């Protein structure tokens, strides 16, 4: 899928992440920036799991995988990559690398972390977290590389501002909930997934999480009693309307 869009007109990340501006940086126009105001006032992510939802969790578990701990969880990482292949390649028909029934790409490196919701070995949902400071050869992280024109499937104007490179911002990608999860359990799965996402991001020093999600995200977030702001235009990517959003996890409450 090709895009001929131009990223011209993007502004530095500090223009919309005022708390990430270098010490002593003078930006008098900051107070007039509506996006910055929205981000400053964005409530902390505090996933709320209603009792009715908790009752459907059964034996669900949530795990954060890394290259250094995945050996402790048997074939959970392999199962995650196989679940991603079923979702993104088999169902959505994305053109992605695959081998031995697993989907993977250049961002599945030791720099990333993988959030998995699972039950009795079955993968129910997953997210990949990558620091925006990541570098692996010519690649960094998905949104930044897309903005630089390195990813054919994502347009260069995916963000309203220049993609940030800061240890306090992590990117969420490869977000999915298995189609095998029945409707009455999906909110429980989503709740566990987001809860573990925010905990993991915070534990790694992040104050914000940025990512591209289906444009109906606002309805989904409201069901979880969460808040976020759009930081990019709505885009058609592989026949799905998507949009970049931003969470704050700096004040995450357990």
Q: Where does each model-flagged region fall?
A:
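Acetyl-CoA-dependent GNAT
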Residues: 129-134, 164
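Short acidic N-proximal helix/loop "leader" segments that mark the beginning
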Residues: 2-5, 9-61
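C-terminal helix-cap and adjacent tail motif
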Residues: 246-254
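Short amphipathic alpha-helix that is part of the acyltransferase structural core
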Residues: 48-101, 113-124, 131
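Short, solvent-exposed loop/turn elements at beta->coil junctions and helix N-caps
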Residues: 100-106, 232-235
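A short helix-loop-beta-strand connector motif used in the catalytic cores of GNAT acetyltransferases and
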Residues: 106-116, 135-137
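A structural signal for short, well-ordered beta-strand segments and their strand-loop junctions
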Residues: 116, 123-128, 171, 209-212
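Acyl-donor binding region in acyl/amide transferases
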Residues: 137-228, 232-246
């Amino acid at each position: 899928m090709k895009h001929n869009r131009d990223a011209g007109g993007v502004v530095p990340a500090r223009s919309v992440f005022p708390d990430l501006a270098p010490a002593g940086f003078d930006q008098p126009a900051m107070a007039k920036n509506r996006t910055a105001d929205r981000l400053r006032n964005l409530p902390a992510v505090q996933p709320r799991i209603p009792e009715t939802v908790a009752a459907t969790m059964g034996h669900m578990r949530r795990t954060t995988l890394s290259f250094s701990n995945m050996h402790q969880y048997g074939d959970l990482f392999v199962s995650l990559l196989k679940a991603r292949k079923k979702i993104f390649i088999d169902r959505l028909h994305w053109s992605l690398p695959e081998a031995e029934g697993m989907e993977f790409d250049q961002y599945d490196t030791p720099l990333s972390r993988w959030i998995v919701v699972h039950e009795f070995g079955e993968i129910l949902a997953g997210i990949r977290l990558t620091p925006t400071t990541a570098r692996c050869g010519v690649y960094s992280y998905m949104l930044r590389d897309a903005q630089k024109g390195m990813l054919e499937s994502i347009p260069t104007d995916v963000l309203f501002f220049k993609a940030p490179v800061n240890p306090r911002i992590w990117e969420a990608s490869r977000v999915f909930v298995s189609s095998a999860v029945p409707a009455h359990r999906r909110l429980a799965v989503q709740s566990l997934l987001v809860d573990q996402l925010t905990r993991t991001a915070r534990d790694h020093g992040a104050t914000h999480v940025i990512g591209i999600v289906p444009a109906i995200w606002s309805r989904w977030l409201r069901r979880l009693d969460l808040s976020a702001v759009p930081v990019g235009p709505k885009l058609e990517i592989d026949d799905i309307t998507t949009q970049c959003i931003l969470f704050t996890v700096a004040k995450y409450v357990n």
